[in-house]
Amino acid sequence: MASASYHISNLLEKMTSSDKDFRFMATNDLMTELQKDSIKLDDDSERKVVKMILKLLEDKNGEVQNLAVKCLGPLVSKVKEYQVETIVDTLCTNMLSDKEQLRDISSIGLKTVIGELPPASSGSALAANVCKKITGRLTSAIAKQEDVSVQLEALDIMADMLSRQGGLLVNFHPSILSCLLPQLTSPRLAVRKRTIIALGHLVMSCGNIVFIELIEHLLAELSKNDSMSTTRTYIQCIAAISRQAGHRIGEYLEKIIPLVVKFCNIDDDELREYCIQAFESFVRRCPKEVYPHVSTIINICLKYLTYDPNYNYDDEDEDENAMDADGADDDDQGSDDEYSDDDDMSWKVRRAAAKCLDAVVSTRHEMLPEFYKTVSPALIARFKEREENVKADVFHAYLSLLKQTRPVQSWLCDPDAMEQGETPLTMLQSQVPNIVKALHKQMKEKSVKTRQCCFNMLTELVNVLPGALTQHIPVLVPGIIFSLNDKSSSSNLKIDALSCLYVILCNHSPQVFHPHVQALVSPVVICVGDPFYKITSEALLVTQQLVKVIRPLEQPSSFDAAPYIKDLFTCTIKRLKAADIDQEVKERAISCMGQIICSLGDNLGSDLTNTLQIFLERLKNEITRLTTVKALTLIAGSPLKIDLRPILGEGVPILASFLRKNQRALKLGTLSALDILIKNYSDSLTAEMIDAVLDELPPLISESDMHVSQMAISFLTTLAKVYPSSLSKISGSILDELIGLVRSPLLQGGALSAMLEFFQALVLTGTSCLGYMYLLRMLTGPVYAQSTALTHKQSYYSIAKCVAALTRACPKEGPAVVGQFIQDVKNSRSTDSIRLLALLSLGEVGHHIDLSGQVELKSVILEAFSSPSEEVKSAASYALGSISVGNLPEYLPFVLQEITSQPKRQYLLLHSLKEIISSASVAGLKPYVENIWCLLLKHSECAEEGTRNVVAECLGKLTLIDPETLLPRLKGYLAAGMLIVYFL
């Protein structure tokens, strides 16, 4: 501490030097010291430092002054409270100084101190005391109105303090309000504006009494309407209060809105602007309370959206009656912008109206159909707006309308309107021609901002309504090309144009673009070569989509792609070969070339082999390998059967090595690539290549990542079907991992389905060491060995499903295996685990294979209903239901009879019935619906709640089989108050 005090003493001494550079360096060093957490100042050092910093605020050199102010921030947190109060007192006194520079620097100092105080929520005594000390001085400075500059600074600091520490000043709020209200009528507009800001921060923390006083004062003054100037101020103030505390002003809207509506009719553009801004604030901040007035607000906004008394649009409307694909004469398009009138404020009114409509559209989702009837046509008509800033807000409002439409495509539709075909989407569809008519001419305007708005609009429109522009492509393509070719276009405009073109290409039929391919290819190719990487990246995306357009592989096409292949290939290969380019461009060049080879590979000749070698190099690069894997997957899946033999020998081992990388996306992508290679190129793959892949598979088959496991199992299934000889080597670690996964309680859904498909494919290969009985023993062995490996019930279900899958693939083995399972259930020496597996396996096998030939099956399962084990009883119930699905005429009447005649087994039998209803086909079950329905109704009043719940589930599922007949019945029971309805 002593050394720190000595160092600071030296700095303080240098600060008194007559050399400004010495003072500057010493102050800078002091600030560095104060910023250290370790610094501790004794009382004497604190006093000296504070005194010196305050003295330096009056330094003749501005740079020294600025540094001294910066020192105040860290200093406040390092000195004791009374020193902070000394700083604040001095700064407040200096604020009233005659010297303007000292006033300014002291104001900045006060803001710095306030900014460093702990937040109000911390309950800091220092913050409370400092704020109270400042508040009294500020209110008197504001109230005096002697010097406007002092007043403005005081208002600024007051607003800052209220926003940060308003909660600490509750006792001062009445006096703050009293000093602020008179300033709303100040002759200086700057004072009024800062007063409004301060009041906005005040209402965030003031009590109800102060808030009510403020609102009632504003309402009273508005009612008087003494002068237009003050009325404008009061409207602005109400809007500011609404923005900061909308939840509090909501209850006063019934009084406020009629006044604001009245002032809208006064011939004062500035007042109208503020009124509409207030409406916008109410709409955003008081959505519930403003609801009754939304229609009024919309009508006012629609009225003033077209308010342009000094300009006549009639001539322009006549010019727009016909849409020309080649656009209007460029020389005429700047004529609107040449009109200027410095006194014309009407554009601000129109802009406020557009912003308010934007707010209404963004917050009133339930009014979408109404918006498309009234707001949408009005906004479309104003796309011709002459003032660029207003036009941008009109476009933004319509964009908001489109964005609100996208998520409500399936809900928020009036059923009556739907019957008439009047959903928001159909209404938008009918307005597309008007939108295009309004936009197409503006896509060639000189204004970059306007053209960007057009592209954003078209992009959103196509996202909301794919295919909407099918009839209008001839009109729009010239506008897109214009921006791509125009030398005055900014980079952002080109990016927006390319992005728009990409979305349009993706969401329309390729045939729509065939007449325009020649015009589109050249500018897109030029953009691929652009030096700015973002333009190149976006252009490569468009190129990739253009390739799909000129040669659509999904459908036959007569379009001749040959003239364009060279240009598209050349521009892409140049980017693919470049090493010193942005990562995004590298990846998109790979993807684009992948699409070119996939769609046009049969036209590339000798270039194909060279390009595939580049892909091989990119596959070896850690940065580009994932994108290359995806591109190769695309190529391998091409119906053109691209010759990949030149790279498979080196490429497949590289792909195999990716399976051990700790990058999940790379593993998944590689498994997809290998799967498609096995399917389409099995004759080009050697046993060594496949062995290299198989060696990497065991770690991937794990419950830690079920999706990777599923992909690995799907790959093995493909291998079993296409290259069965390769599976002779999987009986070791791979099969062990697969069997281990079958026993996992997490195996379900897609992974379980993949596993079942694999076992069926595996047993059908006829591999000698992987026959039916061997696999069956592998699956069921742990259960019969009474191993502790199976601890979860789900494991038994998974094993049973695998057993059934094997049996379906080898139906000749079925009778013997089913007979063995029946004996296992009957055998008194069988453990509960064996019985559980046997019953579940019988159920799964019987679900797909008719077991009615097994004479004792029914009695064996019914006997299992009496087992002391709840799990065995549940499995027996499931088995009976599942077996019944395999032969409904044989088993369903039996189950229904048992439900009636065996009350003790009723609960389990009803669960069997639920399984039948859930799993059987609708066609198979329909003849029995009435019998089942009547039976269920008889048991709906059962005394046991568990039984009633199962009956209710059965009734609900049964209703879905024949809803037209059964749903009205359920409604009838609901109306009659029948008990069963409460359990549905």
Positions of the model-derived regions?
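Alpha-helical solenoid scaffolds in large eukaryotic transport, assembly, and signaling factors
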Residues: A2-S3, E13-L67, C71-V84, I114, ...
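Short coil/turn segments at helix-helix junctions and helix-capping linkers
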Residues: N10-F24, M52-N66, Y82, T90-I105, ...
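Short, polar/flexible loop-turn hinges at active-site or ligand-entry regions and domain interfaces
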Residues: A120-G123, E554
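Hydrophobic residues within the alpha-helices of tandem HEAT/HEAT-like
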Residues: M15, D29-Q35, C71-K78, N94-M95, ...
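Core helices of alpha-solenoid repeat scaffolds
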Residues: S3-S9, D42-K51, K80-L91, G123-T139, ...
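Acidic, serine/threonine- and proline-enriched intrinsically disordered linkers and terminal tails
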Residues: S295-K348, K355, T405-M427
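Amphipathic alpha-helical scaffolding segments
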Residues: D29, T296-I300, K373-L379, H396-L402, ...
